[in-house]
Structures are given as C-alpha cells and as structure tokens.
C-alpha cells in the first residue's frame, strides 16, 4: 500500500503554488506600504507558552494542540496560532526597549488537530499582523483597514466586517455576573463544553456553534451593556475612524472570538460560500498578553487570516481563470546535435531572466508542441537537424498561430526584444 499524506494536510503542486506565491507577494507589498516588518518564529514552542498565552479554557489548548515530549523530556507544541509566539519573541528579544509601536507581520504554517472539512486543515497557513506598544483606537482601525484593503485588492466580494468590544478586566466581571444569572436556569441544558465554561469563562458560551446553546443564549446580556467609560469611548472612536476610512462594518454584540486573551476590540471579516467556515480573518486587542508571557504591561492588537480560505474565496470571486504561462519560450529540439545547441540557447536566455524551457524526454515534434501548450508558453522555437544545417530556427507564436524563420545567430536578440515588448 502506497504511503499517503497525513489526514488534514495537502500537497501544494505546481499550478497551485503560483497562486500562493501571488498571495504572499500581495501581502508583503501591502505590509511594506503600511510600515510592517516580517518576523519568523519557531514552528514549535514550549507548551506553556500556549497554555498561558492562548488560555487553558480554550478549545485550542484543551482539544486541538499537537503536543509531545522531546528527547529532553520537555513538553513541546507545534504552534496552533501566531500571536503568542510573536509576544514571546517581543519579550525575549527586548523589543519593548526600542521605539514603539513595533509593527510586525508573519506568514507560515500552523497546526491544530481538527476534524478536516471544507476550508479547514490540520496543517494550515496564516498571515497575521501584530502591533505592540500602543493602545489608541487608531491602531485598531489601522489593522482592520489593512486587511480590508488587502481583500479589496484581491478582488474578494460580499465581505462583511463585524466589530465588537468585549470589555476589559474592569468591566468584564459585571458582564460575567449578569451572563451567569441569565444562563443559570438552563445551565444543565448547555452542551458539555459550555457547562465547563459556565464558571470560568461564560463569555465563550456566546461563541458556541451548538444549536441548543445558540438558542439558549438568544437575548443574553452583551458586553456592550456593561462597558466601562474607557472601553465605551474606545469603541466609539474606533467606529468613527472606520467610517472615515470608508470600511463597511457592522456592530455584532455576540462576537467574542475563541481565544481568552482578547480585550476591548474584537473583529472578524466574513465572506460567503467558502465551505463550513465563513470567517476568513479574525483579531482583536490583547493588552494583557505580553505580561502573561513574562513581559512588561504592553498593549497589543492584531489579526490572523487563514490563507487557504482566502485563496478559496478569491477563486470563487474570480472564477476559473487561466494563469500566466509557466514558460515564455519552449525550445523544441529534434535530434542530438539540435538538443545540445537548444540547451545552450535556453541556458543563456535563463541567465538573462527569461522563463524558458526545453524538452527533457526526447519526444516528437507533435508531443513537444502539446507540452508547450500545456504550460501556456507564448512561443515555441523549433530547431531540428535540418534547421541547424541551414543556420536557421523557426519561431512560432502559440497565441496567434503564426511562425517565422530567423537566422540562428539573431534568434536570441529577437526573442529577447519580444519578451521585453510583452511587458516583462
């Protein structure tokens, strides 16, 4: 039996990888424009980082982490998210001692043991940004505007930004008390997970996808009902700034997010029709997280987006479109001497920066031209023993179906000129 890839993972093959590369280039471009710098953290961390940072009551820590003991008997976890790692790096490398704010972004794989379904994988990829060192509403508005701008450039349609304030340690206890009082008469009807959340973190019950729990929480007190003056003013200013930036948003009082570290601002970006999950970005403010992982009190805000979901949404928005040709020129060589000469030509063109290819299988003229079509090459250059003897080469435009004979000595100059005229 052939060995297969682990469940919940995927092979990104040629033709698909190019879509990922394009998305990554768009991400890096907009991050440069907004003044964010890339950070790369380890794929595995000490398990305690996520227990303390993400929260021991979360589904991620309780059910979804890939955790193991290494050969030194240390508990290690493959990172399930990026924010805790960035905060750890911020503290460990004393970034808090330099100019603030620190504006960072990351791109990389994350790991969660989830039931694989449409839009969800056990190894998945996230792009995220984190801003540390400033607590102003304008920073919240900037990170939301960044992702809104990115999705607009990617051509995504039917987008919705949902925003909420989940309060702070000063005002959240009052909401917790009111929510527990509301849920207490039907506590035993809650799902098993929500019953365990009732005492420690009842706010998470509002995030439960169980239909019974959703029905029970209809009409429950929201965090907006009990915000302190500071949180209320922060949320009001955020909405004003989003409107000024022409970001279309909706206040969603039931939005609480699934991680314990959020304070004040929480937000999601949703899109329709990409499978089981419609959220393609989520984030919020985490002013206590840096201190939780051993640093000084430091405000922070960020978001993460699932790149697989964004690519799926982009595919739906654009439809099935043919990508750019993998090769600009395919050299069709027939015969040993022609293959040697053709290989030398292709090598010189590649060194100058032209995407060029040559058949490696010694196939027939017909088979090589079919291969050139498959990679959507713009041109095929045909060189056989007869052409070599005459000192010519045939250049065929595969887009127009036209061809010309060129002196072999002039070929590279001519094809390079056409390459530049095509905007390369």
From Swiss-Prot:
Entry keyword set: Aminoacyl-tRNA synthetase, ATP-binding, Cytoplasm, Ligase, Nucleotide-binding, Protein biosynthesis
Pfam families recorded: HGTP_anticodon (PF03129), tRNA-synt_His (PF13393)
SUPFAM superfamilies documented for this protein: Class II aaRS ABD-related, Class II aaRS and biotin synthetases
Family label: Belongs to the class-II aminoacyl-tRNA synthetase family.
Gene Ontology CC terms: cytoplasm
GO molecular function: ATP binding; catalytic activity, acting on a protein; histidine-tRNA ligase activity; transferase activity
Domain of life (superkingdom): Bacteria
Swiss-Prot/TrEMBL catalytic activity: tRNA(His) + L-histidine + ATP = L-histidyl-tRNA(His) + AMP + diphosphate + H(+)
UniProt keyword annotation of Cytoplasm present: yes
UniProt cross-references to NCBIfam families, sorted A to Z: hisS (TIGR00442)
Gene Ontology biological process: histidyl-tRNA aminoacylation
UniProt KW Membrane keyword: no
Gene3D superfamilies: Anticodon-binding domain (3.40.50.800), Bira Bifunctional Protein, Domain 2 (3.30.930.10)
Protein name: Histidine--tRNA ligase
Oligomer status and interactors: Homodimer.
EC number: 6.1.1.21
Location of the protein in the cell: Cytoplasm
